Regions:
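Charge-lined substrate channels and their catalytic hotspots, especially those that engage the 3′ end
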Residues: 1-282, 289-334, 373-374, 670-671, ...
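Electropositive polyanion-binding surfaces
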Residues: 32, 180, 186-187, 213-220, ...
Length: 709
C-alpha cells in the first residue's frame, strides 16, 4: 500500500470511529463492517495502529477501538535514573511519579491521564495508562556473566532495568565487554527485559570503546553499506572536461580557502575584488550533487546519516572520505566543479545584484584560520611575507566582513559568543587537557560570507516559488520571554514585548547592555534558553536569531544533507527548469527530508555533547581534591552548577551546603540560607574543590571552598 492510499484509508477510518453513531469495536468487527477481506485485514490493522500511535483514536481495556478521550494525552516518556520521569506532550513536560509509570521505559510512546493540574511553581502530574510503542529496541551496556546466563547494565541510566541475556544469546561476550543488545522482550513488574547480544564493541578499558559506545547508543551509522563503497569506486578523481562549456569559468579569479589546519574536506572557497566602490564577493561551494545522484546508494546513505558527526577522537562523515577529501574537496591548484553565488555588495552591505551558477574554479591558495589571524590581527611579518600576494585580498575580506556584520547588527542579529572547548586526548584516548576555543578574525570573516550566501540563495528561491529547504528559527514562546523579562527586571534591565512577540533587536540590545557586567554570563544563558531550537522546514519562516527574513543552508553539502538537497534543486532549476512533475516530487519528499534532517542534527548534537561530558568527567576524575575558580551557571532545588573557565561543569549538591538550610527561590534563581540569608545566585564567582567524577554517569561533583568565596 503506497503512502497516498495509506493516508486516504486513515482518514476514512478516523471519520468512521469519530462518527456519533459509532460504538467501540475490535479490529475484526471493523473489518466485517467494512467488508475487508481476510487477506487485506493486515492493512486495516496497520491503519488502526497508526491512528492509535498518532493519538487520534484510543483502545479500551478490552481491545476495542474508540474515540480518543480528550482527557487522555499522548506523548514520549523521558525517564530519569531516580525512577520518576516526564511525558512530553506538545512541548509541555508532565511529571510522572515512579508508581505511575506503568513500567514504561525511556523514549516509549505512551498515553496518560492528568492526575494533578498545574499549581504555582509546579508542573502538571499524570499517570501512564498505556504503552503504545517502545522507543528503544537496542541498548548499549556492560556485559556481566552470571553462571550460564548474563546481564547487561545499560550505559543509559534512564533505562532503569538490567537486561537478561539467555545462555544461547550471549555470543562470545565476557564480563567487562561493551555490547549492543537487541531487546526481544520488554518485561513487566516481575521480569526484567530480555535480549540478545548482537555486537561486541570491545572491552570497557580498550581505547575508543567508550566513544564507540556513545555512537552505538545514538544509533549513528558509521560503516558504509557495500553498495555505497561500490558506487564510490566509480566516482572519478578529476573533473569531466567535456562539461566545461556548460559551466561559468571562474578560474581566473584569485580564490582561496580558509579552514582549520587539519581539515581535509575543503568545501567552500572565496574570491573577492572591489571596483568603483562595489565589492564583488564569490562564495564557491563544492558541487557535491554532481557526483551524488538522487536515489543512488550514496544519496540514500547520506540522507540516512543526515549530517557528519564531529566527536573528540573521530569524524563520522556523511559522505565517504574518497568523495569529501577527493573530487569534492576544493584543493589548491586543481580544477574543481562548484556552485557559485556571486554577489555585488555596496558600501552599506546591501547586496545589489547576484548570480548563482554551476562553475569551475581553481583555488590559488589553501589558508588556515591561524595564518589569516597572524596577518590581520597579529601583523606577523614572516606570515605576511609568505602570503604577500594575498594580503591585499585578506585586508579587503576583513573590510567587507565588518560592513556585513554591522548591517546584520543594525537589523537585530543576536550573537551568543559562548566559549567552546577543545579536548586534547593522548593515543590511548585519555584526556590530557581541555582548552577554551574562541573564534578569531578569520573564522568570523568566513561566517559572515557564508551567512550572506545563505540569505541570498534563500531569497532567490523563495521568490521563484518552487519547493525548497529553509533553515528556520522561530520566535520564542511568549511565556518564556515574559519569564525572562521578569527575571532581568531584578537587575534593572527591560525588554519591550509587543502583542506577545519580541523583535530580535530587543534581545540584541540586552546583550549589548550586559556586556562586561557580572550578570552577563547568567542573562546570556537564560536568554539562550528562552529561544527555540532552529530546524529545517519547507516554509520560509525566517530566522529569529539572525533577524533574517530568508535563510537556508547552502554552504556545506559535504556534511549536511539539506545543503545537498537544495544544490540538487538549484542545479535542476539552472538547466531546463523544474517541471510540474518534479515540483510535485519535491513537494512530496521535502517535508520528510526536513523532518529527518532536523532529527539527525539533534542526534549528532546530543552525541557530541554526551562525548564531551564523558571526557570532561574522565579529565576531572584525575583531579579529585584540587581546587578551582568557577562561576555558578545553574541553580536548582537540588544544588548549584558551577562552570570552570575550561567549560567543565559540575554540581555542588545542596546537601554539601552544610552551614545552613538552603531554600530555592525559583523566581530569582537563587539558593538562600534560612538563618544566615547567605545567597548563591547565577553568575556568582566561587571557589570549588572537585570531590568526585564519574565517567559512566557523565557527572562531576564539587564542594564550595568557604574561605575563598
Amino acid at each position: 500500500m503506497d503512502d497516498y492510499t495509506f493516508e486516504k484509508r486513515k482518514k476514512v477510518i478516523n471519520e468512521l470511529i469519530h462518527d456519533k453513531y459509532y460504538t467501540p469495536m475490535k479490529g475484526k468487527e471493523i473489518a466485517m463492517l467494512l467488508n475487508v477481506s481476510k487477506e487485506n485485514r493486515n492493512d486495516l490493522y496497520k491503519v488502526l495502529d497508526a491512528l492509535v500511535l498518532e493519538g487520534k483514536i484510543g483502545v479500551t481495556s478490552k481491545g476495542k477501538y474508540c474515540k480518543n478521550d480528550k482527557n487522555i494525552l499522548t506523548g514520549i516518556f523521558q525517564s530519569t535514573d531516580r525512577g520518576f520521569g516526564f511525558v512530553t506532550v506538545e512541548g509541555e513536560d508532565i511529571f510522572i511519579r515512579e508508581s505511575d509509570t506503568c513500567n514504561a521505559l525511556h523514549q516509549d510512546k505512551v498515553q496518560l491521564v492528568i492526575t494533578c493540574e498545574k499549581k504555582e511553581g509546579r508542573r502538571r502530574e499524570g499517570r501512564i495508562i498505556r504503552i503504545l510503542e517502545h522507543g528503544m529496541n537496542q541498548i548499549v551496556g556492560i556485559f556481566r556473566k552470571n553462571g550460564a546466563y548474563g546481564f547487561v547494565i545499560p550505559d543509559n541510566r534512564k533505562f532503569s532495568k538490567d537486561i537478561f541475556i539467555p545462555k544461547d544469546k550471549i555470543r562470545s561476550a565476557v564480563t567487562g565487554h561493551k555490547v549492543v543488545v537487541k531487546i526481544n522482550s520488554f518485561g513487566d513488574d516481575t521480569h526484567n527485559p530480555e535480549g540478545e547480544v548482537i555486537r561486541i564493541l570491545g572491552h570497557v578499558n580498550d581505547p575508543g570503546t567508550d566513544i564507540l559506545s556513545v555512537v552505538e547508543s545514538y544509533e549513528i551509522p558509521y560503516e558504509y553499506p557495500e553498495e555505497v563503497m561500490k558506487e564510490i569506486e566509480k566516482i572519478p578523481d578529476e573533473i569531466d572536461e567535456t562539461k566545461l562549456p556548460l559551466r561559468t569559468d571562474y578560474r581566473m579569479l584569485q580564490t582561496i580557502t580558509i579552514d582549520g589546519e587539519d581539515a581535509k574536506d575543503l568545501d567552500d572557497a572565496i574570491s573577492l575584488s572591489k571596483e568603483n566602490g562595489i565589492y564583488h564577493l564569490g562564495v564557491h561551494i563544492a558541487d557535491v550533487a554532481e557526483y551524488v545522484k538522487e536515489k543512488s546508494a550514496l544519496d540514500k546513505e547520506a540522507l540516512n546519516r543526515g549530517t557528519s558527526v564531529y566527536l573528540v577522537d573521530r569524524v563520522i562523515p556523511m559522505l565517504p572520505h574518497k568523495l569529501s577529501n577527493g573530487i569534492c574537496s576544493l584543493n589548491q591548484g586543481v580544477d574543481r566543479f562548484a556552485l557559485s553565488c556571486m554577489m555585488d555588495i555596496d558600501s552599506t552591505g546591501k547586496i545589489i545584484d547576484h548570480k548563482i551558477s554551476e562553475s569551475v574554479i581553481n583555488v590559488d591558495r589553501r589558508m588556515s584560520y591561524t595564518s589569516v589571524k597572524k596577518i590581520l590581527t597579529d601583523n606577523d611579518i614572516d606570515t605576511i611575507n609568505e602570503y604577500k600576494d594575498f594580503v591585499p585580498m585578506f585586508k579587503l575580506m576583513e573590510e567587507l566582513a565588518i560592513i556585513l556584520r554591522k548591517k546584520r547588527q543594525q537589523r537585530g542579529s543576536i550573537d551568543f559568543d559562548f566559549p567552546e572547548c577543545k579536548i586534547v586526548l593522548d593515543k590511548a584516548g585519555r584526556p590530557l587537557d581541555i582548552k577554551p576555543y574562541e573564534r578569531n578574525t578569520a573564522t568570523k570573516i568566513i561566517e559572515d560570507f557564508m551567512l550572506a550566501a545563505n540569505e541570498t540563495v534563500a531569497e532567490d528561491y523563495f521568490w521563484q516559488q518552487i519547493p525548497f529547504v529553509y533553515r528556520t528559527h522561530d520566535t520564542p514562546d511568549k511565556d518564556k520571554i515574559n519569564e525572562l523579562a521578569a527575571f532581568i527586571n531584578n537587575f534593572g534591565y527591560s525588554i519591550k514585548v509587543s502583542n506577545d512577540e519580541i523583535h530580535p533587536k530587543e534581545l540584541q540590545k540586552l546583550m549589548e547592555k550586559i556586556e562586561g557586567s557580572e550578570e552577563e554570563n547568567l542573562i546570556s544563558r537564560l536568554t539562550l534558553r528562552a529561544m527555540k531550537r532552529a530546524g529545517y522546514t519547507v516554509e520560509c519562516k525566517g530566522h529569529f536569531g539572525l533577524a533574517a527574513k530568508y535563510y537556508t543552508h547552502f554552504t556545506s553539502p559535504i556534511r549536511r544533507y539539506p545543503d545537498l538537497q537544495i544544490h540538487r534543486i538549484i542545479k535542476e532549476s539552472l538547466h531546463a527548469g523544474i517541471t510540474d512533475k518534479r515540483i510535485k516530487h519535491y513537494e512530496n519528499i521535502l517535508p520528510d527530508v526536513t523532518k529527518h534532517a532536523s532529527q539527525t542534527e539533534r542526534r549528532a548534537d546530543d552525541a557530541e555533547r554526551e562525548v564531551d561530558k564523558m571526557k570532561k568527567a574522565e579529565y576531572m576524575s584525575l583531579r579529585i581534591g584540587k581546587t578551582f575558580s568557577g562561576v555558578i551557571s545553574g541553580v536548582t532545588a537540588w544544588g548549584l552548577y558551577v562552570e570552570l573557565p575550561n567549560t567543565v561543569e559540575g554540581l555542588v549538591h545542596v546537601n554539601e551546603l552544610t552551614d545552613d538550610y538552603y531554600i530555592f527561590d525559583q523566581n530569582s534563581y537563587e539558593l538562600y540560607g534560612e538563618v544566615s540569608h547567605k545567597t548563591y545566585k547565577l553568575g556568582m564567582k566561587v571557589r570549588v574543590k572537585c570531590t568526585g567524577a564519574s565517567k559512566v554517569l557523565r557527572t562531576v561533583d564539587f564542594q564550595i571552598v568557604e574561605d575563598d568565596i
